């Protein structure tokens, strides 16, 4: 019942933001996540969920996937304006769900910051994860690249969905070894 009222409050707040001609970015998600850090469990998803992650190129790739699916006639919910941490993704979901948490879409396509893969998808369905690259970036938040890769590797140990990895980046390609029982691992390369 608590989550119902959180979603209701965020719907009202979103309406106020629209009236004021404001997007709100990750504001709705920040409030909802503060009120209940396990709110991702509340949402009901009956469509494929695709996540794109990388240090560089995730926004363009995410938006290309979403645009391609929309052009094919699908209803796509996506965080096309960025907001790729847990609160931004949660804001996108809150704007597109019913009060009971049902998300009406043919596809959910999310750009997700590399360090937030384990946070968002611990309690939220994920069917396909695309990882493009890792570079030394935002050391204050992510730490060294190796520690980031190890956190994602730990998440992937129990992940059995589609995993699409850039074989040209050795740090990305090695994530395919995280869960030997996952038969849904695919690699791409420029060659």
Which ranges hold each PLM region?
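Phosphate-binding loop of NTP-binding sites
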Residues: 2-189
């Amino acid at each position: 019942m608590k989550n119902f009222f959180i979603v209701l409050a965020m719907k009202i707040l979103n309406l106020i933001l629209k009236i004021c001609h404001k997007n709100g970015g990750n504001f709705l998600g920040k409030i909802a996540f503060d009120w209940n850090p396990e709110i991702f469990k509340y949402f009901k998803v009956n469509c494929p969920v695709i996540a794109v992650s990388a240090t560089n190129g995730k926004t363009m790739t995410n938006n290309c996937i979403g645009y391609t699916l929309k052009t094919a006639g699908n209803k796509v919910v996506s965080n096309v304006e960025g907001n790729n941490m847990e609160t931004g993704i949660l804001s996108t979901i809150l704007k597109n769900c019913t009060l009971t948490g049902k998300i009406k879409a043919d596809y959910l396509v999310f750009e997700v910051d590399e360090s937030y893969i384990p946070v968002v998808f611990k309690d939220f369905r994920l069917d396909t994860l695309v990882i493009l690259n890792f570079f030394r970036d935002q050391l204050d938040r992510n730490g060294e690249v190796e520690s980031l890769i190890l956190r994602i590797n730990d998440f992937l140990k129990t992940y059995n969905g589609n995993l699409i990895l850039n074989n040209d980046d050795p740090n990305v390609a090695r994530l395919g070894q995280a869960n030997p029982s996952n038969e849904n691992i695919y690699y791409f390369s420029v060659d």
